[in-house]
Amino acid sequence: MQLTGSQVIIECLKEQGVDTVFGYPGGAILNVYDELYKHPEIKHVLTSHEQGASHAADGYARSTGKVGVCMATSGPGATNLVTGIATAYMDSIPMVAITCNVGVSLLGKDSFQEIDIAGITTPITKYSFIVKDVTKLADTIRRAFSIARKGRPGPVLVDITKDVTANKVDYVKQEPVFTQPDCSAFTEEDLDKALHMIEKAKKPYIFVGGGAILSGASETLKAFVEKVDAPVCDTLMGKGAYDGTSANYTGMLGMHGTKTSNLGVSECDLLIAIGVRFSDRVFGNPKKFAKQAKILQIDIDPVEINKNIIVNHSIIGDVAIVLGKLNEKLEQQKHTEWLSHIADYQKMYPMTIPKEGLSGPFMIAKIYEMAKDAIMVTEVGQHQMWAAQYFKYSKPRTLLTSGGLGTMGYGLGAAIGAQTANPDKQVINIAGDGCFRMNMNELATASRQKLPLIEVIVNNHVLGMVRQWQTLFYKQHYSATVLDDGVDYVKIAEAMGAAARRVTTQEEFNAAFQEALESKTPFVIDAIVDSDDKVWPMVAPGAPINECFDGKDFESKNK
């Protein structure tokens, strides 16, 4: 049957099982929005800004594992998606961004709102398409979804000229193609070599990243950990891949990782890296990282092998499949003495919570106590690290955070996406006051959609993480980090249709958070904390991770 390009776009979205689109209309994409109006089976969430739409699509994808979809018009509409696309790219999140451009006859003529968005996004997508021929439209959209899902996931952009959305073409419905993970990159010899390394190790440590979540490998990973009988640490992106309440779990590795994980990895004789990219935030000084260990790396992307850290052996493949193969062959290991040594570290270096005063660690721990099944979302900064340190993530896809790009302003849009996709779950966004300012306009979106998400602002009136570095490494030169300008976040929240409370004590926070849990609309808690609160432990930039220090260490050193 013959359909217009706009109709083809909607039919292709339906083919792919898309039930929600986040976006903002405009002239070039108006034909598509007119067609979308006729299809209530696809929910459209109108955000307050296109960046919010891209973050919402990201949050939808992270919390479900499905492809998130966002749309924007030409020119500034398209460029406003860029930060969200880059955020998804850095964290390997499947997303399809659909933009519309000026007509073919107007391309290259500096036309109104013309922009080469495909060119702009080429470095931050798995692929960027521009469609100038309606006969190629359907297959391009199908390819976009396939590319976004296949192998290491990521965002794909499809830019469509306006005339293509109006032209007619024959359309034949197709079922979506879901390709199975490719196992051809590794051999039995690869598995056998890995098994030999594991069986020979006396002090193995398992290091888990976001790739384990993207692969859906949590159950296979659990069985692998039990067979290897080893302690487990993770990255920020790997939170929830392995049960954070397990006795084997020692917390995050790296700059703000636990002392146990940092010291343990520095002492281990085998580091099994699963779905990690060895970020600079993890290894500290690469020349001194895990120097006593042989390293076995398992990852679906060959580009990650030996990119930042040289490894002794690698297996390239889907994490769940590789671990499953290893589990079939691996005999039960026993490392009682090693695990006891690591347990001693955990007793020596616990993650402590200030007993008095309102603080980030206290609030995160209380949130865990009152809402341990929530989907946690964060912005970027000190509060992000506290959310990683003090909430025990027992399931995958329950911490949504910008790890690679470190995008301030990510959280509220992502929370909207997650809450839209998971209406029966509690979604909580942890923000700093600096981050909240970035995209607080999306609170109006949450109110309009009647989303019962909770926004906790850890309000220290400064850019906390930057101030921490200025305190520790820049002689307390607080350049451009003070935000004490009287902005009333409670009034802003109420003006946007949300309930809001300001709290200054532990008791006030407990009461406000209970009220927030019972709310049917967005609820903002403006929590006032000390400007000089710091994230501990910490590894200084460029230092080896075994030189991690906490507040007491820092005070002793600088007496």
State the predicted function of each range.
Residues M1-L330, K366, P452-I457, F473-K475, ...:
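N-terminal alpha/beta PP-like core and its mobile active-site loop of ThDP/TPP-dependent enzymes
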Residues S6-I10, K14, V18-D19, V32-L36, ...:
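Active-site diphosphate/adenylate-binding microenvironment
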Residues K150, A371-K372, S447-P452:
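Basic phosphate/pyrophosphate-binding loop/patch that engages nucleotide-derived ligands
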Residues T135, K173, H196, Q292-V380, ...:
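Phosphate/pyrophosphate-binding active-site segments
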Residues Y24-G26, V45-H55, C70-G77, K132-D133, ...:
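Active-site nucleophile and cofactor-binding loops and adjacent substrate-binding regions
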Residues L157, Q297, V377, I430-A431:
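Generic enzyme active-site microenvironment
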Residues L107, F112-Q113, I305-N308, S314-I316, ...:
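Thiamine diphosphate
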Residues G26-I29, G75, S92, P155, ...:
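Glycine-rich phosphate/pyrophosphate-binding beta-alpha loops
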